[in-house]
Amino acid sequence: MLFKNEILRCYLIGGSQDTHHDPDEFLTKVEAAMQAGITAFQYREKGTSTLSKAETLALGQQVRELATKYGVPLFVDDDLELAAAIKADGIHVGQKDQRIEEVLAAVSDQLMVGYSCNTAAQVAHANQLNVDYIGTGPVFPTISKDDAGSALGVDGLADFVEQSAHPVVAIGGISLDNVGATLTSGCAGLSMISMVLGADDVAGTVKKILELY
């Protein structure tokens, strides 16, 4: 699958740890989000996840089926073996994950590649790499990732957007109250976890996000 900036517009991230460690609830909410129009999904079974490697693979295969059904690009967080096993469309690499250069060499243009950048130095490094996009944040305080770091704010995000040679997807503390302000940064899109997976009305939340573009 070829990368397009539009993939980043409404980019959902998550795993069973984001739905009370309930894989069934996770799949139900992911399907509702895909049906409502999310533009990408990143399978991220991490942090407080209690799934075994086999369970993570089995759940990932179900996510792959949903992504195929709804035509949603599927990324895997920091696991080349899993990405290959479920035939993901892309992989996302964090600063604390496998070295980005090793990932780029391994995928050899077969997968879309995203890269987390949270400082100006990291963005400058990314500018020298053949990645498809960078994820930058947290824009606002967040509890979805326990290692997220301090918030950049919209102005900090805008500085990174200007510096980056790649499209930027914003992450961290995104809510319906701040979507509009976040988009003024010039970012290509928004990524979220709890805003969608923690919502009572997943489909309604996704549709409201898309309406704000």
Curated annotation (Swiss-Prot):
Its EC number is 2.5.1.3. Binds 1 Mg(2+) ion per subunit. It holds the Pfam family TMP-TENI. This is Thiamine-phosphate synthase. It comes from Limosilactobacillus fermentum (strain NBRC 3956 / LMG 18251) (Lactobacillus fermentum). InterPro entries: Aldolase_TIM, ThiamineP_synth_sf, ThiamineP_synth_TenI, TMP_synthase. Transmembrane segments: none annotated. Mg(2+) binds at D78, D97. Keywords: Magnesium, Metal-binding, Thiamine biosynthesis, Transferase. GO terms for cellular component: cytoplasm. The keyword NADP does not apply. 4-amino-2-methyl-5-(diphosphooxymethyl)pyrimidine binds at Q42, Y43, R44, E45, K46, D77, S116, K145. Gene3D superfamilies: Aldolase class I (3.20.20.70). Signal peptide: none annotated. Condenses 4-methyl-5-(beta-hydroxyethyl)thiazole monophosphate (THZ-P) and 2-methyl-4-amino-5-hydroxymethyl pyrimidine pyrophosphate (HMP-PP) to form thiamine monophosphate (TMP). GO terms for molecular function: magnesium ion binding; thiamine-phosphate diphosphorylase activity. It catalyses: 2-[(2R,5Z)-2-carboxy-4-methylthiazol-5(2H)-ylidene]ethyl phosphate + 4-amino-2-methyl-5-(diphosphooxymethyl)pyrimidine + 2 H(+) = thiamine phosphate + CO2 + diphosphate; 2-(2-carboxy-4-methylthiazol-5-yl)ethyl phosphate + 4-amino-2-methyl-5-(diphosphooxymethyl)pyrimidine + 2 H(+) = thiamine phosphate + CO2 + diphosphate; 4-methyl-5-(2-phosphooxyethyl)-thiazole + 4-amino-2-methyl-5-(diphosphooxymethyl)pyrimidine + H(+) = thiamine phosphate + diphosphate.
